Amino acid sequence: MSYDVRYLINKGYSGDFGIERSFNITAVELVKRKIIAIDSERISLVQGPPGTGKTTVFQQVINECLDETDENEVFLYVAPTNKLVADMLARVASIYRNQEKTLEDLKKEVRVYGSRFRYGGEFEHLRKPIDDDVKIVLSTEYQRIYESEAARRYHLLIDEASKSPIHRPFITISDRLLELIQQSEKEGILESLNVIGDPKQAIALGDEYRGREDLLLLTNLIRGLLSEKLKMEVDRGEIDITEAAFQELRGTFYEFLEVTRRLPHPSETPISVGFYGGNLRAYKKADEILKEVANQWDTNEARELSNLNDDYFKTVDILNSAITTGVPIIYVHVRGDYLRDYLFNERRAKVGLLFSCAIKKILKENVTIVAPYVDQQLQMKLRMHHLYGDVLGEDIKAINFTTIHRMLGAEDSHIIAILGKERTGRLYHERTIYFMEPEVFNVQLSRHKKLLVIVGDLFKLRREAKKMYEYLSGEEPRSFQESSLKLKVKQLEMTTEQILELANISSYNTLRRVPSVSSGDGCLFFRWE
């Protein structure tokens, strides 16, 4: 996909990208202190869980500090994808509009570097080298900046650094750094270093980085700023590295964005307790959100679907119960293991497709099926067209299919989360998706704005996580990787436990005596036979 620079700038000049500043005020003030030199230490680290508006922090900082920096200082925004750079360009255009700056001002003061931008003749100037007039540079991690005249000093704004290795965001200024080293210059080009990300969403890492938080930029910087005592506790697996930052660095080097505007309460509780030490809270309440959803309920469509067969009848009944009682999570227990070398579960596919059909037909709202594996995603998409095309008609095009890794950074009104293999695997190389990267579970549970439907076996996932944690606790960690994995597995267990607690079934160790239907304050449980 390519991005039209003209369209993005016009979008910024015609629309408003701001959110209420009060939600991120502490993070914005922390970064501002580093930029305008109130603090002598010029590093700020911001952790932003799902839906907390990470990128808007940098937007607000640029807006408030643009006229407070001197003529040699430049804001250098670096992001891992062209999409993020494109989004920030529209936000910068919005800033220029709000400050009553003209389009000519923007052309003169902004540079945009990426591999998928169409500049056209009018905006060709935005890809030229940096000169004395430039104030803002937006770039992907793999571009290199070039200065045509006087050397500049940069406020480095690194966005979505959740899974960025230590070196990658600095590729952009690597030529200038090398030049200074060769010239033995003492004057640095980095005026401040500001990093935003979330280690708890660091997924899809390469083998050399998986489980190695010490090789990732954000966690490495946190670790370097910790006291020796806390650093040793982190290395021994006694405390999570972000929890250590929350305790010791908050307000000086680190801030935590604690309000999610995406997830309706209490559906944020599982990941808050499991991955964020109970510090994440939701701005919106599920009962208020689902009242609006209930008003969209099409009774005729619901009746027609229910009359098709027993499976549709059950699906519509469960969906209606959750919406009318204001419960944002539906946990449909579906056993049935994945075969050893086959990443498709037919029973879970069937249930996921039934719920997506019901949501689309009855509510007329967007729904995305989030699968753990590409095989599961593709097979479900094929079955949707083959088995449910007659039911959905043209609506079939509006149901999205994706994997957890592709859903990172995205959201939808309703999410169907198909669980992957819940067993651990005997050997390290056999370890399954949730035990290789427990953060995957966090991402899968945090994409919805209204309803989350979980299809799988949470009892088994909890049991296996507990078993693995006990095993790792009995061994002396031989590396930072092992101590880190132990804590992550515990977070996986706690998250699963919290979902079961929201459905009032956490006290059951196995499924044997669990009622076929159970509902609590935040989750409706149904055993699919």
Regions found by a protein language model. Name each.
Residues 1-6, 521, 525:
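N-terminal accessory nucleic-acid engagement/regulatory domains that precede
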Residues 4-20, 63, 68-156, 160, ...:
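Conserved P-loop NTPase motor core of helicases/translocases
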Residues 12-45:
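Conserved pre-motif I regulatory segment
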Residues 44-47, 76:
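Short hydrophobic/aromatic beta-strand immediately N-terminal to the Walker A/P-loop
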Residues 50:
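The conserved Walker
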Residues 53:
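Conserved glycine(s) of the Walker
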Residues 57-61:
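Hydrophobic positions on the alpha1 helix immediately C-terminal to the Walker A/P-loop
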Residues 72, 81-83, 143, 155, ...:
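Conserved helicase motor core of SF1/SF2 NTP-dependent helicases
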